[in-house]
From Swiss-Prot:
Gene Ontology MF: a single term: phosphoadenylyl-sulfate reductase (thioredoxin) activity
Descriptive protein name: Phosphoadenosine 5'-phosphosulfate reductase
Active site: C239
Superkingdom as given in the UniProt entry: Bacteria
Location (main, coarse): cytoplasm
This protein's record includes keyword Oxidoreductase: yes
UniProt KW keywords: Cytoplasm, Oxidoreductase
Subcellular location: Cytoplasm
Pfam families: PAPS_reduct
Length: 244
């Protein structure tokens, strides 16, 4: 696999970019997660960043990538509506793993947003998408720009939802390379990694949560529900960061 030219790939239409990366992705599918991270660091341009929502299984990708590339900037987009358990989990993992945490927030505070727009998450898909644009997408775009990111690692997995089922290891999103080292891991592999390295699930895992985001758009899992139905009232799975 040869080095890739980000500028040249960004000039291509989306379909052509996918085709241009197809051969590389076929080879990356053969590597394990650590091998994918190592390949990306050797062959893709820096600066490098890792995003995390500090969700249920977040410790895996945080530990895996940080072990190979210590001090990598870890981007968190904080909406101001995370669970108290999430904020404590962020503190715990940041200390335990010595993370280089970079927190980005909307330019409008949560209270100001509610005063201006009402509770956007109660206004259907359109309201949720506006909420996500303000609190997730714009802060992430700002983070990528301010950190001069050219390669972005994330912990998405195909097993998590239908919208992620066909994602490749390597893609281009928001003008940068995006690498998903654990994309093909199943829940058993996640568990084994956590056990091997003395890591924990998010505290709300024990309370029946399979996925954790904001307090007002996250539900406990109930029998018969798909994991993606526990977020955004089942109206959508993605918060916007991993779309586009």
């Amino acid at each position: 696999m040869s080095k890739l030219d980000l500028n040249a790939l960004n000039e291509l239409p989306k379909v052509d970019r996918i085709l241009a990366l197809a051969e590389t992705n076929a080879e990356l599918e053969k590597l394990d997660a650590e091998g994918r991270v190592a390949w990306a660091l050797d062959n893709l341009p820096g600066e490098y960043v890792l995003s995390s929502s500090f969700g249920i299984q977040a410790a895996v990708s945080l530990h895996l990538v940080n072990q190979i590339h210590p001090d990598i900037p870890v981007i968190l987009t904080d909406t101001g509506y995370l669970f108290p358990e999430t904020y404590r989990f962020i503190d715990e993992l940041t200390d335990k793993l010595k993370l280089n945490l970079k927190v980005y927030r909307a330019t409008e505070s949560a209270a100001w947003q509610e005063a201006r727009y009402g509770k956007l998450w109660e206004q259907g898909v359109e309201g949720i998408e506006k909420y996500n644009d303000i609190n997730k997408v714009e802060p992430m775009n700002r983070a990528l720009k301010e950190l001069n990111a050219q390669t972005w690692f994330a912990g998405l997995r195909r097993e998590q939802s239908g919208s992620r089922a066909n994602l490749p290891v390597l893609a281009i999103q928001r003008g940068v390379f995006k690498v998903l080292p654990i994309i093909d891991w199943d829940n058993r592999t996640i568990y084994q990694y956590l056990q091997k390295h003395g890591l924990k699930y998010h505290p709300l895992w024990d309370d029946g949560y399979l996925s954790v985001g904001d307090t007002h758009t996250t539900r406990k899992w109930e029998p018969g529900m798909a994991e993606e139905e526990t977020r955004f009232f089942g109206l959508k799975r993605e918060c916007g960061l991993h779309e586009g």
